[in-house]
Every structure is written in C-alpha cells, then in structure tokens.
Amino acid sequence: CGNSYVENRPDLWNSKVWIEELIELRKHLGLDEIHLLGQSWGGMQTLEYVCNYKPEGLKSIILSSTLPASWLWAEEAQRMIAQMPQDMQDAIKKATESGDYSSPEYQAAEAEYMRQHCAGEVTENDPECLRRPKKAGRESYVVGWGPNEFTPLGTLKDYDVIDQLG
C-alpha cells in the first residue's frame, strides 16, 4: 500500500487519469457497489466522477474538505490572504506576479497561510498514521494544482462542477 507514486510523469497528473484509475481499481477488486470518500483533491475527483461518469453501484459519497470549483477556492483564498499581515500579503503578491516562489519572505507567508488555513506541522503528539514517512513527490501537486494552495494553475485550474450539482 502506498507504493503507487510514479516520478517524472507529469502526463499522469490530470483528472481523466485519476478517474480511469478509480474505474480500473473498482473492476480489478470487483467493487460493484461502493461508498466513496473523497478527501481534499480526492473530493474533487469524486465530484467529477459522479457528475461526468455517472457510475453504477455508487451507494453514497462522503466529501471532506473539498471544493466544487477552482475559481471559488482561489477567490476564497484571496479573501483569507487579505486578512494576513501586510508584509505577508506583499510577499505572496510579489511571488504570484513574478512566478518566483523561492524568497524567504514568500516561504514564511505560505507557511503561515498553511498553518492558519490548512494544516500545521505534524508533531510527535499527532497520531502515528500522520507521523509515518510518506512516499510522495511535489510533481503531482504542482502539475495538478499549482505552486501553492491559493494559486490554481495546474491541470485542475478550470475544474468546476457547480452547475452540475443539484
């Protein structure tokens, strides 16, 4: 488990591939009926799977910490950035405009944004499942989403299922 990450394959980091993987996994495991949990990015995939693929045997979905549209996420992120100290707002704006996310000022601002709105650092007090090493790379995140939580520029930048939700 957890050994499916593939490096240096940016062509894999898009919705179509992820949903095809889910379809193939269901077939391989004979999962004719399922209850599907979509957490974060997985929630986006769950919504797209339900809205655009109309899968059979889907008994229920559980969505956790996800979004219906990238533009809405970016808009809300900008609202939260506007509540940060001015120097951090300036560092984020400068990095976004230049495409250079390497400055210490930007790194500090992004870390603070993540601490406030996403997740803090994992400590020894956290459950073991959060502390164990994970096999992952940044490529899937950057190609799929973008350079950070608040700048969707990747393959999911146009993701929007709002009109399909009823």
Place the predicted regions along the sequence by residue.
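Short hydrophobic/charged patches on amphipathic alpha-helices used for structural packing
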Residues: 23, 162-165
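Active-site loop/oxyanion-hole signature of alpha/beta-hydrolase fold enzymes
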Residues: 1-41, 53
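Alpha/beta-hydrolase
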Residues: 82-83, 90-163
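Conserved hydrolase catalytic core segment
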Residues: 32-79
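Short aromatic-enriched loop/helix-cap "lid" or pocket-rim segments at secondary-structure transitions
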Residues: 5-8, 72-77, 125
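Amphipathic alpha-helical segments in well-structured domains
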Residues: 15, 19-22, 77, 81, ...
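Extended interaction regions within the primary functional domain
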Residues: 8-13, 36, 44-45, 58, ...
